């Protein structure tokens, strides 16, 4: 990597950030596309977000990614925000504009792109989402924005699912999102659902943990997506595949949220072939063999 006086800087703000694979994504993309750009991480404590964003703008930083715990707090430091990111209430990408930064949520763009490349259509699809955290909220907004037929939002604490359902249904002026206690999954009618697992259950080292351990539930799936990428094959994915259906982990979602941010910063389009090259680098860095 050749860093010069003209090299533009992008980075990740959050805490912790030492484990992040975002530098691998963006520095490989810069090398592949010949952009004079470098990406690193910045540990930012809670309460220091506003000063960090102001400092980044003063230092002529091209763009930032934002990770936990700052995705909501950073909104107050923006001069503009993408409407869907505003509705979700979470921003993970800042793009430099006149006077400051504009916020986007490329987490949902990443999942949308992964689904598109895998041939999974959300429009008119029936969806089941497991979990009701920040990722579930963003994905529920995505499903409704893509005109999913219905979205069952399952969580152990149904109150959290109800809050998301009310927000999404109000935003899109419909009642397609249906909150449900996860214990009542048998009440979901029919089959052929896109099932998206958004919780941390099954994350390494708890590889054999799963939110629902009942073969009957997985018969409802047409396809499964787990946002976890370590392990590469979660128990959730194995249960989907046992029904003869395809299942995907979250590594490509992680990759494509980065690709979407990179495109916003550099006003360019990354081809699927270029993204696939970076995907191989990510697999190598993480020691993942699929």
Regions from the language model: what does each represent?
Residues 2-118:
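Phosphate/diphosphate ligand-binding glycine-rich loop within oxidoreductases
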Residues 146-172:
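NAD(P)-binding Rossmann-fold cofactor-contacting core
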Residues 9, 38, 126, 149-151, ...:
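Residues at the starts of beta-strands that form the adenosine-phosphate
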């Amino acid at each position: 990597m050749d860093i010069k006086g003209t090299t533009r800087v992008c980075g990740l703000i959050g805490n912790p950030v030492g484990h992040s694979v975002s530098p691998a994504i963006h520095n490989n993309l810069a090398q592949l596309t010949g952009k004079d750009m470098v990406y690193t991480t910045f540990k930012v404590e809670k309460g220091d977000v506003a000063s960090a964003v102001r400092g980044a703008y003063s230092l002529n930083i091209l763009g930032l990614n934002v990770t936990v715990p700052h995705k909501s707090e950073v909104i107050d430091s923006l001069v503009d925000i993408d409407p869907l990111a505003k509705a979700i209430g979470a921003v993970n990408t800042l793009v430099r504009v006149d006077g400051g930064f504009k916020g986007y949520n490329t987490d949902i763009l990443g999942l949308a792109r992964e689904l598109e490349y895998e041939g999974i259509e959300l429009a008119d699809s029936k969806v089941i989402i497991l979990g009701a955290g920040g990722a579930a909220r963003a994905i529920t907004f995505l499903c409704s924005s893509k005109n999913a037929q219905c979205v069952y939002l399952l969580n152990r604490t149904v109150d959290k699912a109800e809050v998301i359902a009310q927000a999404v249904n109000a935003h899109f002026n419909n009642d397609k999102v249906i909150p449900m206690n996860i214990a009542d999954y048998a009440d979901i009618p029919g089959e052929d659902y896109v099932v998206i697992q958004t919780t941390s259950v099954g994350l390494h080292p708890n590889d054999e943990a799963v939110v629902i351990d009942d073969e009957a539930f997985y018969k409802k799936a047409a396809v499964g997506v787990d946002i976890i990428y370590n392990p590469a094959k979660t128990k959730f994915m194995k249960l989907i595949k046992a029904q003869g259906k395809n299942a995907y982990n979250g590594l490509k979602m992680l990759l494509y949220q980065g690709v979407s941010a990179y495109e916003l910063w550099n006003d360019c389009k990354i081809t699927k072939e270029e993204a696939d090259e970076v995907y191989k680098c990510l697999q190598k860095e993480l020691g993942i063999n699929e």
